[in-house]
């Protein structure tokens, strides 16, 4: 059930961003296979292009230099250090990396997104049918007063 809610929330955030009304991406657990991601790479494997954009709430503006740490299980259904890396968004808040299809049920990729002035986002992309390319938007919340 929680996976269905996340997919629906990501779709809502994606559609809302084009309506100039950003909804923050929901937070999801880092899972049991989290380990600190220490390698910066644009490509960790081949077969799946992952691209998207990081925007700010509530104005839907691109967030440049956001750090996206990602990890996932591979085609064999196992988590591996080779599929853990981080990268940064460009000046337009966009990111792109290549990986392999996450062969778990449901297929998913974990993300931790950090950017100066924004709350840290821990979330997951969830898929259904095998694809060669996926694209989505993540919306960050501005940090409140501490």
Q: How would you name each of these model-derived features?
A:
Residues 20-146:
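Beta-strand-dominated extracellular/periplasmic modules and repeats
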Residues 14-19:
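Sec/Tat signal peptide C-region and signal peptidase I cleavage site
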Residues 4-13:
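Sec-dependent N-terminal signal peptides
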